[in-house]
Amino acid sequence: MERKERLRAGIAAMGPDISETAQDRLLAYVDLLKKWNKTYNLTALRDEEKMIVHHLLDSLTLLPYIEGAQTMLDVGSGGGQPGIPAAVCRPDVQITLLDANTKKTAFLRQAAIELGLDNVRVVSGRVEAVSDVRADVVTSRAFAELADFVSWTAHLLKDGGYWAAMKGVYPQGEIGRLPQDVCVEKVQRLDVPGLDAERHIVILSKR
């Protein structure tokens, strides 16, 4: 299956309304990942089909959970997942991509420029040291244990905001280790077309 058809079929199976222009931009992002990966080691994946599944479709499972947001922070953004696909599909949301690795943030800045993502800001640094970002939604994909994630980012969450942590298998142990002042709003299993591995999203808020 041609890559454009594979992406379109995956999106159709998942349900979000994503324009042809946005889909083309998502594939252009994959091209940038492949180009920069040779030097910067942004992803262990080399196969384009796997990139579409793991980096695009997997990231797009976040979209229903940022519907009401105006601002989003992607912590430990790495090669830009889920932040860049989210930014492509939600140009109305101001998205900050944060990573401590300067090579990765250099890529993220270039990707935002080349993809024309005016709604993206890139911040280089450790999350604990960042103080000039506030977001309605703070998200991450496989960044850290939940207790650490909320502890390190609580100062970056707006009042009334929430965390959206993208995880693999159901993180029962991690949920049990969350601090008492954090409320588990929802744990939802995610279906990613073409991906056999388990995926869950954990929605958390301050009590």
UniProtKB/Swiss-Prot annotation:
Entry protein name: Ribosomal RNA small subunit methyltransferase G
Binding site for S-adenosyl-L-methionine: 76, 81, 127-128, 141
Keywords for the protein's UniProt record, in alphabetical order: Cytoplasm, Methyltransferase, rRNA processing, S-adenosyl-L-methionine, Transferase
One Pfam family hit: GidB
UniProt function note: Specifically methylates the N7 position of guanine in position 527 of 16S rRNA.
EC number(s) reported in the record: 2.1.1.170
EC top class, as a word: transferase
Domain of life: Bacteria
GO cellular component: cytosol
Organism ancestry: Bacteria, Pseudomonadati, Pseudomonadota, Betaproteobacteria, Neisseriales
Tagged with keyword Lipid metabolism: no
Protease is among the record's keywords: no
